[in-house]
Amino acid sequence: MKLQVLPLSQEAFSAYGDVIETQKRDFFHINNGLVERYHDLALVEILEQDRTLISINRAQPANLPLTIHELERHPLGTQAFIPMKGEVFVVVVALGDDKPDLSTLRAFITNGEQGVNYHRNVWHHPLFAWQRVTDFLTIDRGGSDNCDVESIPEQELCFA
């Protein structure tokens, strides 16, 4: 089955999470006007009194054509990925309770100036880089096991 890859926008992604970007976002000045603060761009949610982690994940580029065959979700916390050097990357997401609902399966490509924050329980493909090795600032939950993995029928990513 082929899965069309769409440009990432907050409107298209809102059911799955937040788009972390400055484009079309409000800001205010701090530090004597030297800094524009784009405040509260994503909801970080951590359950069970665990702690928030800030990490760097170095992702390897995927082999093309890319075929998706599994999704994961994190029921106890949100998970954010922000590329550190302006790299484009692709995310694959789906809604669903116990298993991914394939009717909601979507793929999005970023513009190089966007990160994503997955809502709790949103099914998504594990992180991968697109064209080159990419470092991602990652904000997620530390503590007990927080990852469910489900196999899905193979989906090949298609670009317009």
UniProtKB/Swiss-Prot annotation:
The gene is allA. GO terms for biological process: allantoin catabolic process; purine nucleobase catabolic process. Pathway: Nitrogen metabolism; (S)-allantoin degradation. This is Ureidoglycolate lyase. It comes from the Bacteria. Keywords: Lyase, Purine metabolism. GO terms for molecular function: ureidoglycolate hydrolase activity; ureidoglycolate lyase activity. It comes from Escherichia coli O1:K1 / APEC. NCBIfam families: PRK03606.1-1, PRK13395.1.
